[in-house]
Amino acid sequence: MQKKVIAAIIGTSAISAVAATQANAATTHTVKPGESVWAISNKYGISIAKLKSLNNLTSNLIFPNQVLKVSGSSNSTSNSSRPSTNSGGGSYYTVQAGDSLSLIASKYGTTYQNIMRLNGLNNFFIYPGQKLKVSGTASSSNSTSNSSRPSTNSSGGSYYTVQAGDSLSLIASKYGTTYQNIMRLNGLNNFFIYPGQKLKVTGNASTNSGSTTTTNRGYNTPVFNHQNLYTWGQCTYHVFNRRAEIGKGISTYWWNANNWDNAAAADGYTIDNRPTVGSIAQTDVGYYGHVMFVERVNNDGSILVSEMNYSAAPGILTYRTVPAYQVNNYRYIH
C-alpha cells in the first residue's frame, strides 16, 4: 500500500513538472489579427499592466505578428537601444513599442530624414520589431518590382500586399486611386495597415464591409506642402506629420495648439464638432492647448486618437480612446 502511495505521489509530481515546464515554455506570444492586450493577458493569466511592463508598451496598441513576452522580467533597454551590425556594412536598430523616427534618430546622433533615406521610407510609419538601418549607406531599391505589382483573383479586382513603410496614400498613388477608395474597398474605418496585409486596390467593395465611419468627404480641406517646423516631440509636431502621411498636409505656421482652430479657419479649413477619420481634434484647455489625430471613429461614438506629449514624454507616441461623452469637448479641423 505504501509503495502505491509513493508511486502515485511520484506520478503526480512528474505530471506537475511537465505542466510547469510547458507553462514556462510559453514565454512569448505572436500577436494574431484581431487580438488585444486584454485577450492575450487573459490567455496567459497575467494582468494588462504586467504584459505592458514586460514589453515596455506605452499604450494598448499592438500589431499582428508582433512578438510579446508573456512571462519573465521586463526587457531592458540596454540591448534594444544598441544597434546591431552586419557584414554588409552599417548598423541596424530594432524598433520598440513607443518609438518614432525622430526618437531613434536622436538616440544615434542622426536625423529622421537620414533614417528614412537609409531605409527607403516615404512616410513616418514604423512598427515594433521592424529593423531599421541607422548608419551606413542607403540600400538599393530592391523590393518594389514585385511588391508594387498587384495580384488578381477569380472574384474580380486586384490586391496588393502591404510592405514595411507603406501608407494608404502611398499605395493609392501607386495605383492611380485615392486612399478613400482603398478604405471603401476593404471596409477600413481607420488608417492602420501592417506589413503582410492584403488590400484590394481595384474592383468592387466587399458586401460585408460594415464600416460606419466616413472620411472627411465634402469638407473644405486645403493641402500644404510645408516642412515641419513645430517643436520636436510636441502634439503639434506629431499631428503635422500624421496629416502629411495621409496626403493632407497642413500649415507649419499655426503656432501653439490653442491657436490651431482659428489659424485653420483663416486658411480655409472646415471646423466643427463632428470627428471624422483623419481630422484633428483640438482644445484650448491648458497653457498651450492640445491637438490629436483622429485614427478611428467607433460605433459607440467614442474616438481613437494618436498624440504626443499628453500621457508620456515628448516624442513618445501614444494612443487612447476618448469616450463619446467627451467627444464634443473638442473642435475638429477637417
From Swiss-Prot:
SUPFAM superfamilies the record matches: Cysteine proteinases, LysM domain
Gene3D superfamilies with a match to the protein in the record: endopeptidase domain like (from Nostoc punctiforme) (3.90.1720.10), LysM domain (3.10.350.10)
Composition bias, Low complexity: 71-86
PROSITE patterns, per the entry: CHAP, LYSM
Sorted UniProt keywords: Antimicrobial, Bacteriolytic enzyme, Cell cycle, Cell division, Cell wall biogenesis/degradation, Hydrolase, Repeat, Secreted, Septation, Signal, Virulence
Residue ranges annotated for the Peptidase C51 domain, each copy included: 210-334
Taxonomy, superkingdom: Bacteria
GO cellular component: cell surface; extracellular region
InterPro entries in the record: CHAP_dom, LysM_dom, LysM_dom_sf, Papain-like_cys_pep_sf
Region of interest (Disordered), residue spans: 71-90, 137-156
GO biological process terms, semicolon-separated: cell wall organization; defense response to bacterium; division septum assembly; killing of cells of another organism
Intracellular or extracellular location(s): Secreted; Cell surface
Function recorded in the entry: Peptidoglycan hydrolase involved in the splitting of the septum during cell division.
Protein name per UniProt: N-acetylmuramoyl-L-alanine amidase sle1
Organism: Staphylococcus aureus (strain MRSA252)
This protein's encoding gene: sle1
